[in-house]
């Protein structure tokens, strides 16, 4: 009977170890291919996203599907553990231009409702929200991104340049922290 108890304890321990290993492997696979939490650092996406907020990034679009204009994307930086959160403005093949505080894609005026709060603040002090630039032709395999806080964002206009598709980690769908600020991101 003692041998039987010893065997049962070994089997029980083996089952626990096996369950823990499976859980760790599943967690790593989910984080690598499905979604991952990211920290928003800085004010370049204000007022849409705020410094210190945490969001989930869906990585599946990187492997299956296409990024869409207006998506909030996470970009892997050149350095390890450096990421940028920006809005995807120009797709491969697009021509992007900003003129008189109005965005044009392929010569057509594009509405940017997510900028309304920042635009009001800029108009109140008599400045443009976004300086004129372009036209910029986005090559195949690249994206043009900008932060929603146009006056304080390093993006495709001024430092990040055009973004390779392989550097886009995924899209943000919602903020999960702080808990009193849980919401979808648009």
UniProtKB/Swiss-Prot annotation:
Q: Which UniProt keywords apply?
A: Cell membrane, Hydrolase, Membrane, Protease, Transmembrane, Transmembrane helix
Q: Which Gene3D superfamilies match?
A: Umud Fragment, subunit A (2.10.109.10)
Chief location category? membrane
| Catalytic function, reaction form | Cleavage of hydrophobic, N-terminal signal or leader sequences from secreted and periplasmic proteins
Q: Which residues cross the membrane?
A: 20-40
For the Extracellular compartment, the record's topological domain ranges are 41-186
Kindly list the GO CC terms recorded for this protein: plasma membrane
The segments annotated as topological domain Cytoplasmic are: 1-19
Per the record, membrane topology reads: Single-pass type II membrane protein
NCBIfam families named in the record = sigpep_I_bact
Q: Which family does it belong to?
A: Belongs to the peptidase S26 family.
The identity of this protein, by name, is Signal peptidase I
Q: Which organism is it from?
A: Bacillus licheniformis
Task: Point out the gene that encodes the protein.
Answer: lepB
